Amino acid sequence: MESLFFAMRIITLLFLLINSSVFANFQMNENMQKTYIHIINLEFDKANELLWTEQKDNPTNKIIILQENYIDFLTIIIGEDEAFFTAAKDKKSDRIDFLQAGDDSSPYYLYAQAEVHLQWAFARLKFEEYLTAAYEIQKAYSLLEKNQENFPDFKLNKKGLGFLHTLVGAIPNKYQWVLSLAGMEGSVASG
């Protein structure tokens, strides 16, 4: 009887280990929180060191991609280097695909995709790719709205939606019809 119990424990442990390594995840762990602090302090070398460590130790963590995208976004916005922008924008599609392969029951699943779209929208605005930027803003908006429905207590949704509602609300009334066509609404007050 003990050997059967032992065998069941081993099988259960193997199942958990296999599932945790096979299924993609979103872990905003301590390492990723430190990385974020380095990024917002524009300490990209330190952030990249932590990202490399996380990639080695936890390669299925989808937050890595979000942080890498944030570094590229800030590099583009601050550096205004069109060559870097052109080279980096090829990564966007792969990053979205990678995030979409994640755990869709996580509040980070849609949020991370929305953040990538939003960051690229503003990078594109910087280099006058207005039509694509508008599409990306609309995509980010719809992803955040859906995530807000699914995870109403997830605070990061409120950050993104607040920003977008303020942005939408600041658009002059004579252009609000365009936003209606895109399914977007908001106001400075609601943002």
Please give the residue ranges for each predicted region.
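Sec-dependent N-terminal signal peptides
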Residues: I10-N19
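Positively charged n-region of N-terminal signal peptides that target proteins for export
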Residues: M1-I11
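Hydrophobic alpha-helical membrane-insertion signals
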Residues: T53-E54
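Short coil/linker segments at helix-helix boundaries
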Residues: M28-E30, H38-L50, E68-S190
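Boundary at the C-terminal end of the N-terminal hydrophobic targeting segment
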Residues: V22-F26
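N-terminal glycine-rich anion-binding loops that anchor highly charged ligand groups
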Residues: I64
